[in-house]
Regions:
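Active-site regions of enzymes building and remodeling cell-envelope glycoconjugates
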Residues: 27-29, 48-53, 66-76, 182-188, ...
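Active-site environment of divalent metal-dependent phosphoester hydrolases
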Residues: 10-14, 35-41, 57-63, 93-97, ...
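Binuclear metal-dependent phosphoesterase catalytic core
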Residues: 6, 15, 64, 77-81, ...
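Active-site neighborhood of phospho(di)ester-bond hydrolases with catalytic His/Asp-centered motifs
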Residues: 5-7, 28-34, 52-57, 73, ...
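A short, gly/pro- and small-residue-rich
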Residues: 47-58, 148-151
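Conserved catalytic scaffold of divalent metal-dependent phosphoesterases
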Residues: 5-14, 55-146, 213-215
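N-terminal active-site segment of His-dependent metallophosphoesterases
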Residues: 1-46, 116-124
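A generic local structural motif
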Residues: 14-20, 37-41, 71-73, 113-117, ...
Length: 216
């Protein structure tokens, strides 16, 4: 299964030219947030691959106008062709803007707890999809780009094979890795775009579930 992860910065290769060519062979698109609605909608015209997304902290406009043809998996456990995905968008709260997706550590921890039963129902998760990184795991030094400590707890409890996030642009720090590992989890910073491949999930799990607030 070939997956395209995108976040924060629209890719010129996808947005301006060669879109169909760059999406050829892509089975699934994961958006980690902070991308214009029209960008995601544009991509739907050139691929049959589902586009799953969580909200970034700057996606306040999504409250009034969610991107058409895409699937919101925020606050959800979504299973696609056997791949179990937990979605948690937003960033740490760093100002008082009410139209943005910002959360305190306590608020995010509460969101995580609400997903426990859904994750248990499908036997765990394979991929954690978020906007922010985990605390101390390639997050930023400033308040706005600090990661969530509860994401470390998620990685410890569920041990997903993949953790895909955005928020911390790679050009913020030359030492930030695009890909690293934490235990048995491959951690991917999806800033702009990144393509990776995973084995096809267990065919016994190839059923489609939609839980929580996920919607199309």
């Amino acid at each position: 299964m070939k997956i395209l992860a995108i976040s924060d910065v629209p890719s010129k290769a996808l947005w301006d030219y060669g879109t169909r060519e760059h999406l050829e062979g892509i089975d699934l698109i994961l958006s980690c947030g902070d991308l214009p609605q029209k960008y995601l909608e544009y991509l739907t015209n050139f691929t049959a691959a589902p586009i799953l997304y969580v909200h970034g902290n700057h996606d306040g406009s999504y409250r009034e106008n969610e991107p058409g043809g895409c699937i919101c998996v925020d606050d959800s456990v979504y299973v696609w062709k056997g791949l179990r995905i937990m979605g948690l968008g937003g960033s740490i709260r760093y100002n008082n803007r009410e139209d943005s997706f910002q959360y305190t550590e306590r608020e995010m921890r509460r969101r995580v707890r609400k997903l426990w039963r859904k994750a248990h129902h499908v036997g765990g998760i394979d991929l954690l999809l978020t906007h922010s990184p985990a605390a101390g795991l390639n997050d930023g030094n400033d308040r706005a780009h600090k990661g969530f400590a509860c994401f470390n707890d998620l990685l410890e409890e569920y041990q997903p094979k993949w953790f895909v996030h955005g928020h911390v642009h790679l050009n913020y720090d030359a030492k930030l890795p695009r890909v690293c590992t934490r235990g048995g989890t491959t951690v991917i910073n999806a800033t702009e775009r990144y393509v990776f491949e995973i084995p096809d999930p267990d065919p016994l799990q190839k059923r489609k579930f939609l839980w929580g607030s996920a919607k199309k």
